[in-house]
Amino acid sequence: MGKIFDYDGVPVLHTTSGDLKGYFYDGVYIYKGIPYAYADRFQMPVPSKWNGVKDATNYGFVCPLQNQDTPNGELMVPHRYWPQDEHCQSLNIWTNKLDPEAKKPVLVWFHGGGYAAGSSIEQVAYDGVSIAKKGDSSLVSVNHRLNILGYLDLSPFGEKYKNSANAGHADMVAALQWVHDNIALFGGDPENVTIFGQSGGGMKVIDLMQIPSADGLFQKGLVMSGVMEGDPLGAGEKDGTEIVTAMMKELGFDDVAQLETVPYPQLAAAYAKVSPAIAQNGGYIGGGPKKGDYFCGNPFDAGFREHAHQIPMMIGTVYGEFATFAPAAYDKNKLTAEEILEILKKVYGDNAEKVLDAFKEAYPEKNGVDVLAIDRAMREPTVKLAKLFAKGGGKAYLYNFALEFPFQNGKPAWHCSDIPYFFGNSDLVEICGIPDVSDKLESEIFGALLSFAKNGTPDHEGLPHWPETEAEDADTMVFDKKTEVKHNYDDKVFAEINKVLKPWSFMDMMTDNIQH
């Protein structure tokens, strides 16, 4: 028999916000666009309430973007685009059982896009059916306020704006509170919640570990490609006086309250006009959460909170991240050893041979020219953060997704290319169609996620033993055609590269093909 659909037979659920009705398809109960909170612009969210039965068969609005959606790179990272509105606080749930006693592991997904873009349904691979059906878990994905709606500091202009710079994060905490209060209705265990996210979503996972009001709302965290040192997104340490004053001047306003009601496109246009000059002069332009009473700050600067060390963490990167979006300038499979060395000398000069030797020691199966695509954005900071976490007593499990794809003469893994495997959705992404590789790799990665969500450790029968990171020592599970644990394996590569190249800059690797 084919896939079964049911709507009329699906019971109405009585949540803390109101009555809710979803639908059933192919073994999974699906609820879309559940309003978990409401907020006026720049204000803290309040719990949602509605009368009657809320139809949960349509995704909710996604947060407005500052720039127009531009389809590109769809083969590498297939996207979905959706109507936008700033009242975007909604979540989606996939589960295979509506039994309050089922106590299934709960996974809550925070999307990528930095703090400025993205949505809970942005990527095709975000679909939650596999986690619910094959993974026997409940999957929740969350929309929240972004960019200037979620992260613009107006606190110098009045007490009512006290936490406007963290409004987007406050939305996420409100979503977690809604999940805690209601997920048992969907078969989930409110005391076994794993939050996970990629890119900006990974950053959000770390941030939530640094927010006291989120304590107790999740028990584990998975950080995917979400660690960078410094201030790459421009949050800054100063307050919003300069940027907000400049926006008001651009709009011809004399009262900050006018920013609360001006149409979003005009607000975004004013920000886009005045922010570059302020950023160039080192001023605050928003862009991320702001350290203070609500958010305790980046752990590189502020250290991890004591409570954070109680939360086991999976944390990792992909081989190339941003460096591999643009096509290579050559067919590496046709290069001789001499040609490879000459190419590397153009980048690493007299240190090229040492770089190549260290790289071949770390990745003996890869083409030597692939060292040019190695991730210098996130891998080193990720290892550093995992060690910092371990030093404080936390349990961290490092990974690196190093698969080469059959595209453009063998493209190393790029930012987002691991997502289909974590969601058990490699069959939804065409470029993952790699015979004898993708099924095995998905089993390894998907199995690690599910084991971590259930037990707090990613170990499972399909993998070699996965050791915890230590304060001065790092074992990494390298997911590839042959998955294996490697010990401090790429330290020498980066040491040799860093003798020649300046520290990585976020803007150095930005291309028109970057996805999130």
Model-inferred region functions:
Residues 1-166, 190, 432-445, 455-463, ...:
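Non-catalytic accessory segments of hydrolases
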Residues 34, 379-516:
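Mobile gating loops/cap/lid regions near enzyme active sites that modulate substrate access
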Residues 112-113, 167-171, 199-202:
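Active-site loop->helix "elbow" adjoining a glycine-rich segment at hydrolase catalytic centers
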Residues 162-184, 239-242:
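Alpha/beta-hydrolase active-site loop
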Residues 181, 215, 224-339, 368-391:
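Substrate-access "cap/lid" subdomains that shape
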Residues 186-198:
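Alpha/beta-hydrolase fold nucleophile elbow
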Residues 202-214:
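Short glycine-enriched nucleophile-adjacent loop
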